């Protein structure tokens, strides 16, 4: 009996788990780590932690009522000790003050976000964005979202934003509760936009009064269940917004063309689909990573703060310069939006011919901006105060005419609002000298020079550098003191000291230079810049032509179905700006072309037959643009399609044709008529030198053949 008990006794150094481990084969065909029973893996641990944080953010106390899987939280701590704990953001010592200009600037830089304070003075815990920003589907193409203070929602797509409670910031513009909804365009052709929750002062109300106010503000938009959900999960000092699917004639018009419809669609399919993605998809938007949004550097934030402060006290002239695709237009939009937060309007002088902001390309324009800019240039086409059609995308070999046009447009500036001047991205060789001429002619108070690590070296445009550098048509300070030289008289004319002091030539008074390091991300490079710029110019033309569409209740009609205006030959003069065309071929150049509708001083009443041809390029006001869709030689009339009203069209007496062409998608998309499409043909001779079967952009990958390195013979 004693022997049997001894036989069943286990050795003290061997356990059942050790015997099982010894009995397993030593050859393992999988590299996956061995898992102990009762311990979660990293993926399960991360999923459990996300669920606990989500439950805590939605108001549930998971410590008191343990959810499913919480019994292994203690064991999870043993696995989490091997990884370093995440650093908590610094807690400010004082509660946030009401939003100011500097606070608005910091929202554009994700590195400057601070932890907001709750009503009890304790910091609000910041977790992943998809946890602290609850989203609820309201139906009928509407979504409700709540943003804690200091957090942002970066998205792609187009939508209409309404601030129901709190304050929001988009592209530098502050949207307060009670303001009209704003249309926001966050398309993938540019950096994505971010809707930020702006910290505001804690209201002197009780919790019950705040909940009652939120319910009253949400009543016109939501149902009772939705209001209860908002009150239950409302973050302290948060903001409530409603996102709606956008319906406008501009959007519907762009969707009818293949060359522009893809701009409004999502770029690619998502990797993972969740409930938030399904909810936001109903209104046509999607959450994006914060790193894809607009981010300003510290120097950019300081420059914006200084410019906003000086613009509130006066009307400074601000000139922006920099290389191509460095972020001048983006900086201009942010500056304009921030200025509109405190002043009623901002004047804008467009000197960039290739990439205009508010007009079709090829124009020098002056206009007053009174509404925020919440999208790319082709989404906010405006009517200028004065505009001249230059007709080309650059001013190579025609600098004098370009400077004369800029001075002609600049004379209409009344100094009622701050003026922002946008310049071209040509800052090398003659482009730099032309920029020096513009600084002397326009005499800005501030020059904002954007630079980047990827751009070539550009001299710093200080006031001393501009004074000592010769332009194309203006001289440096040293040469100006030697006397004046007029091209018409050469060196045979001399002036006295009094005549020099009273000379109408521009006198440079100096400026303050603000150097801004650009951190904007751009998808353009030397190979695809021409392709991108052409697409943006076509979108600007389509944005202007969308004004031809009737209001929303009416059906959308193609352009070729609209009734054009009939303009007699004897009523307007014609001029081709970018080339010398024989008089016998002038009507071929005008037909099916993009024309500027201008007004010149000369009277056209003495001409009876026509067409009337101008001998030189005029500097005159351009009232708008149109398409010459046909010429009737029997009735001797032009058929013009334009959104200009008839009362303005009566004052037009000149048609200017430039190098800006009509987008090809307009000719290709002509539904309805059967047979051959007008102005589109496939009958051409490929044997002509220079002809090719492939129509489109040059393939740069095959443009530069790679030669193999051959070893030399010994």
From Swiss-Prot:
Region listing for Disordered, in residue ranges: 80-133
Gene3D superfamilies in UniProt: P-loop containing nucleotide triphosphate hydrolases (3.40.50.300)
Example of a GO MF term: ATP-dependent polyribonucleotide 5'-hydroxyl-kinase activity
PTM sites of type Phosphoserine: 128, 502
EC number: 2.7.1.78
Superkingdom: Eukaryota
Region (Interaction with LAS1L): 495-714
Classification via Pfam families: CLP1_P, Cupin_NOL9, NOL9_C
Signal peptide location: none
GO biological process, one term: maturation of 5.8S rRNA
Residues that bear N-acetylalanine: 2
Catalytic activity, as annotated: a 5'-end dephospho-2'-deoxyribonucleoside-DNA + ATP = a 5'-end 5'-phospho-2'-deoxyribonucleoside-DNA + ADP + H(+); a 5'-end dephospho-ribonucleoside-RNA + ATP = a 5'-end 5'-phospho-ribonucleoside-RNA + ADP + H(+)
Biased composition (Pro residues): 86-98
InterPro entries in the cross-refs: Clp1/Grc3 (IPR045116), CLP1_P (IPR032319), P-loop_NTPase (IPR027417)
Principal cellular location given in the protein's record: nucleus
Localization annotation: Nucleus, Nucleolus; Nucleus
Protein residues bound to ATP: 322-329
Homology family: Belongs to the Clp1 family. NOL9/GRC3 subfamily.
Function field: Polynucleotide kinase that can phosphorylate the 5'-hydroxyl groups of single-stranded and double-stranded RNA and DNA substrates. Involved in rRNA processing and its kinase activity is required for the processing of the 32S precursor into 5.8S and 28S rRNAs, more specifically for the generation of the major 5.8S(S) form. Required for the efficient pre-rRNA processing of internal transcribed spacer 2 (ITS2). Associates with LAS1L to form an ITS2 pre-rRNA endonuclease-kinase complex and is responsible for the transport of this complex into the nucleolus.
Protein name as catalogued: Polynucleotide 5'-hydroxyl-kinase NOL9
Organism placement in taxonomy: Eukaryota, Metazoa, Chordata, Craniata, Vertebrata
Gene: Nol9
């Amino acid at each position: 009996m004693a022997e049997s008990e001894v036989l069943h006794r286990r050795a003290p150094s061997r356990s059942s788990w050790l015997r099982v481990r010894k009995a397993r084969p030593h050859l393992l065909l999988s590299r996956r780590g061995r898992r102990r029973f009762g311990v979660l893996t990293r993926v399960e641990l991360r999923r459990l932690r996300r669920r606990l944080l989500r439950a805590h953010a939605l108001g549930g106390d998971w410590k008191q009522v343990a959810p499913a899987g919480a019994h292994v939280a203690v064991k999870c701590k043993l696995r989490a000790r091997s990884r370093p704990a995440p650093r908590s953001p610094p807690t400010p010592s004082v509660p946030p003050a009401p939003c100011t200009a500097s606070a608005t600037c910091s929202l554009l830089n994700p590195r400057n976000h601070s932890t907001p304070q709750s009503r009890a003075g304790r910091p609000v815990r910041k977790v992943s964005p998809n946890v602290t920003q609850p989203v609820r589907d309201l139906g009928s193409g509407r979504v409700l979202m709540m943003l804690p203070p200091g957090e942002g929602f970066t998205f792609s797509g187009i939508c209409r934003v309404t601030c129901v409670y709190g304050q929001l910031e988009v592209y530098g513009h502050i949207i307060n509760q009670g303001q009209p909804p704003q249309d926001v365009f966050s398309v993938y052709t540019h950096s994505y936009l971010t809707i930020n929750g702006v910290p505001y002062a804690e209201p002197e109300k009780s919790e019950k009064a705040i909940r009652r106010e939120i319910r009253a503000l949400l009543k016109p938009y939501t149902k009772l269940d939705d209001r209860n959900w908002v009150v239950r999960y409302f973050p302290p000092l948060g903001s409530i917004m409603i996102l709606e699917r956008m319906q406008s004639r501009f959007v519907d018009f762009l969707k009818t063309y293949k060359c522009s419809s893809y701009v409004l669609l999502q770029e690619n399919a998502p990797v993972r689909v969740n409930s938030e993605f399904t909810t936001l998809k109903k209104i046509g938007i999607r959450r994006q990573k914060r790193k894809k949004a607009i981010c300003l550097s510290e120097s950019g934030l300081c420059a914006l703060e200084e410019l906003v402060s000086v613009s509130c006290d006066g009307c400074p002239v601000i000139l922006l310069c920099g290389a191509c695709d460095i972020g001048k237009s983006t900086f201009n939009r942010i500056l304009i939006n921030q200025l509109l937060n405190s002043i009623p309007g901002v004047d804008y002088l467009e000197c960039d011919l290739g990439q205009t902001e508010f007009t079709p390309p090829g124009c020098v324009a002056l206009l007053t901006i009174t509404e925020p800019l919440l999208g790319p240039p082709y989404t906010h086409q405006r009517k200028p105060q004065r505009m001249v059609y230059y007709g080309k995308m650059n001013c190579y070999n025609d600098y004098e005419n370009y400077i004369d046009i800029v001075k002609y447009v600049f004379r209409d500036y009344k100094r009622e609002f701050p003026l922002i001047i946008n310049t071209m991205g040509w800052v090398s060789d003659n482009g730099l000298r032309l920029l020096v001429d513009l600084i002397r002619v326009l005499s800005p108070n501030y020059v904002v020079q954007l630079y980047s690590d990827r751009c070539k070296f550009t001299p710093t445009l200080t006031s001393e550098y501009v004074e000592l550098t010769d332009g194309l048509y203006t001289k440096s300070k040293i040469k100006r003191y030697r006397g004046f030289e007029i091209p018409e008289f050469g060196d045979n004319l001399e002036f006295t000291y009094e005549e020099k002091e009273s000379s109408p030539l521009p006198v440079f008074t100096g400026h303050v230079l603000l150097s801004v390091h650009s951190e904007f991300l751009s998808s353009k490079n030397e190979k695809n810049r021409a392709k991108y710029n052409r697409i943006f110019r076509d979108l600007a033309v389509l944005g202007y032509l969308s004004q031809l569409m009737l209001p929303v209740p009416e059906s959308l009609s193609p352009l070729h179905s609209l009734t054009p205006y009939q303009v007699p030959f004897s009523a307007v003069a014609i001029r081709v700006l970018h080339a010398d065309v024989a008089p016998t071929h002038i009507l071929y150049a005008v037909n099916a072309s993009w024309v500027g509708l201008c007004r010149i001083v000369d009277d056209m009443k003495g001409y009876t037959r026509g067409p009337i041809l101008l001998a030189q390029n005029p500097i005159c006001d351009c009232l708008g643009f149109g398409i010459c869709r046909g010429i009737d030689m029997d009735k001797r009339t032009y058929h013009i399609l334009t959104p200009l009203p008839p009362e303005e069209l009566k004052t037009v007496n000149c048609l200017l044709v430039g190098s800006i062409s009509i987008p090809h998608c307009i000719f290709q998309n002509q539904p309805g008529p059967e047979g051959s499409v007008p102005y589109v043909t496939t009958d051409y001779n490929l044997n002509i030198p220079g002809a090719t079967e492939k129509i489109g952009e040059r393939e740069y990958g095959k443009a530069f053949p790679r030669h193999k390195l051959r070893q030399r013979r010994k």
